[in-house]
Amino acid sequence: MIRVVTLDSYDEKQLAKFSRTLYTAFGVGSEHTGQFELPAGLPEPLDAEKALDAVKGVRAYKDDKVLYLTSRKLKERELPSGTVPTNGFSRFGKDKAIITSVGHKDLEVGFKPVARHALHQLGHLWELHHCLDPRCSMYPPWTPSFAAGEPTFCTFCREKSEQKIRLAKS
């Protein structure tokens, strides 16, 4: 089950469409679990890693994945290749990820790029690595073409995610 937790207010119809997209991509249930508040004192732009640590936990089963959705800006990250914009962060192979819809008026206007970032971060939770296919949601998100793509996986990444999900269920 993918549990979507909002840290800011979003339209319920848009969240339902967002959850359906996650269900279509992964083949597991997806639901909006609720809206939580970020603890006071977190400076903006948010440090994605610290925000994941600070936010209140969600009641979930061991194989559930929790996706936090915020409209606040996330702090850029330093990588060996340089500074990259951060539209999301996940703990590889773990259970929590965060993405932002910053730069889009609402979830409907920015649906494709936000959904694509969601698939990307959730893919990391199921231990998917970056993909070389620019049409795939696991393509590196800091590339210029990433936001224009559809929220889908290539055949290889889809099969690998399905395999990981099946293993988690058994």
Functional labels for PLM-detected ranges:
Residues G123-H124:
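Short active-site segment of divalent metal-dependent hydrolases/proteases
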Residues N87-P113, H129-S170:
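Metalloprotease/metallohydrolase-associated module, dominated by Zn2+-dependent proteases
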Residues H120:
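Conserved phosphoacceptor histidine of two-component systems
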Residues Y10-H117, H129:
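Metzincin-family zinc-dependent endopeptidase catalytic domain
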Residues M1-E12:
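Fold-level signature of zinc-dependent metallopeptidase catalytic domains
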